[in-house]
């Protein structure tokens, strides 16, 4: 099985040994499987960095370094926004009122035949995308 990691899973895994035990166990169990990330999640992380920067520039810089590492580690497993994803997104959003970022992540997963790993299962179920909650 292959997974598209939602932003909340990426953020949790960033905590390392302090991350939720169930998420750490899930990540260890699925290590040999294919994990992907959407450019939409990278954009959400960037938004968080920029909102944090005026209040806590040191923390923002730390998260920015993590984001750079994340991009490098995922390499070609960072999935772009493509024409196919745009078409799928249009079909989703026409029928289901969702947050733009969630619907774009769902469209990316559907286009690539991936299961979304997320804490926010209820946000993705209306899209018809397979979901898994690694938080339990």
Tell what function each PLM region has.
Residues 1, 106, 110-136:
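Acidic, PIN/NYN-like endoribonuclease modules and their adjacent C-terminal/linker elements
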Residues 1-38, 51-69, 136:
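Short, well-structured N-terminal submotif of metal-dependent ribonuclease cores
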Residues 10, 42-45, 86, 124:
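A generic structural signal for short hydrophobic patches within well-formed alpha-helices
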Residues 37-40, 104:
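Aromatic- and histidine-enriched alpha-helix N-cap/loop-to-helix transition segments
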Residues 39-40, 82, 120, 135:
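Residues at the C-termini of beta-strands that transition into short coil/loop
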Residues 47-53, 61, 72-117:
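Active-site neighborhoods of divalent-metal-dependent phosphate/nucleic-acid chemistry enzymes
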